[in-house]
Amino acid sequence: MIEHGSVVEHRRVIELRRVARVFEVGTEQVHALRDVDLRIGQGEYLSLMGPSGSGKSTLLHVLGLLDRPTGGQYLLHGKDVTALDEAEQARTRRLHIGFVFQAYHLVPRLTTAQNVALPLVLAEVPPAERRERTMAQLRAFGLLDRTNHLPDQLSGGQRQRVAIARATVTRPELLLADEPTGNLDRANGLEVVRILEQLHDDGITLIVVTHDQELGRRAHRQLRMDDGRLVGDVGEGLGPNPGPNSGGLRGQSEDGT
């Protein structure tokens, strides 16, 4: 089992016990995850790296309750969430987990404000509180002057800021980011990283999937996957963030995907 000292010192948020994920492709079985054991403490900042097809995104989807493991257990705050039905898993996602994706996944017909407010609508937050929290997010992410813009009227960096604002409007404790700088140039990529790291400094548990070694090394704890297995776990847990200009963060992942 891959362990880490910080989990002893900080309240455990996540525990995976021999988690496996097998996909049926025709007559073939593809083992995307193989007996993954992992513990993550509250407030950690992790990167998840490895070659294409190593299982990084599958693991992130399992952690985010977007996919169910074929075997093993996923404990979130000690509760086996693999045993929950679809409605219970959806409620757990809304309460505890935020997502940021490479492709933004904004709703094209909704304005910036409407995209940010969408999780609050789904959570049935009252309209007055919904507006207040949405405007607070727009202000915090420098998007007030883009409140009524549609996604195709925004730059890539602005779209990703909208996506992060939407992901955190419900105040989740866990933020999962899958190649968050992959579609951005260097300047916008660094700005997105700065925002994510500020959210971590504010107390959120942050897990970033990336091909970019320079981005991965910014994390305090660095996990490496290969062929569906965790094969490396290095770092010092909750140490200080590197400076905003450390490293030459590329705006695109190292293999261009």
Task: Locate each region found by the language model.
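ABC-family P-loop ATPase nucleotide-binding domain
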Residues: 1-22, 232-257
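H-loop (His-switch) and adjacent beta-strand-loop-beta switch element
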Residues: 222-235
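ABC family nucleotide-binding domain
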Residues: 11-225
